[in-house]
Amino acid sequence: MTQITRLTALQLSEAIHNRSVSCVEVMNAFLERINTLNPDLNALVNLITQEACLAMAGESDRQLSSGNSAGWLHGIPIAIKDLFNAKGLATTLGSPMFPEAGAQQDDPHVARIRGAGALIIGKTNVPEAGLGGHTRNALFGLTRNGLDRNLSAGGSSGGAATAVSSHMLPLADGSDMMGSLRTPAAFQGIVGFRASAGAIPAATDADPQGLGLTSIGAMARNVSDVSALFTTLCDVPAAHRQSPRGSSGHLKGLRIGWLGNADGHWPMAKGVLAQCQRALENLQGLGAQIDLCTLPFSIADLWFCWLTLRQHSM
């Protein structure tokens, strides 16, 4: 079999469920890689003990032996972004200001991850309070890029991106207010998906003003894994969804606004706009209506608006 930590999340799921590899073997493989890389990369924080990790994996194996699977993530290790609550783990927001007592319950999307069988082994590092395009804080220090330790990991989901790009984890959750999933994913050659506002439920205290600036999303090394995790995170009662389409599989009638590079104001790497154009054509083929947009105000005004809203949301 291909080295366990090189498998995609969906490949791991298949291997675990057809019993070609055990949950304990999977956990041991990822723990070995974490023990080797994380002391330098510093992507994962508040890790539970190795003994506790292996005990969870052993229980997952026993459940499978009894014919019981919690879901497609059964036995797959994952860590939660340290802005969100995972029962029993401290939620520090990367700041010495916040208590390190274990959370009393999972946040809604974390409960979905756990409910699908994932084994939560710790947290992923963030800039303090999740504010910043690079990941470092006074509590845990600097997170390095998983592809090149001399480069920035990006932020604020930098710990998650590094854990995934370095194969310490197969996939991760994250959140994005203005690039916090997409930036670290771009910096590290993986896929980061910012879901539409409200598509994935968040704890009420995550957005007390109800501005909807932050969206939860998924990270992985390929689109298929991101899609699978996104589907799991969206699998909630309709009453909890703000997004009008939820996890619908078709795009007929959906309007998509496209700004492109805002008439040259936003520099793009070579090939990016052409790739986006191909994606727009695919979306149009699935029934979406593409509206080419222009900003009715200056880029400077847009930036000032963003800063004002972010400050208010804090």
Residue ranges and their predicted role:
Residues Q105-F230:
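Short glycine/serine-rich loop segments
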Residues W72-H109:
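Enzymes and membrane/adaptor proteins characterized by extended Gly/Ser/Thr/Asp/Glu-rich
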Residues A70-L73, R114, V164, H250:
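Extracellular/periplasmic catalytic domains that process cell-envelope and extracellular macromolecules
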Residues M1-N68, T232-M314:
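Amidase signature
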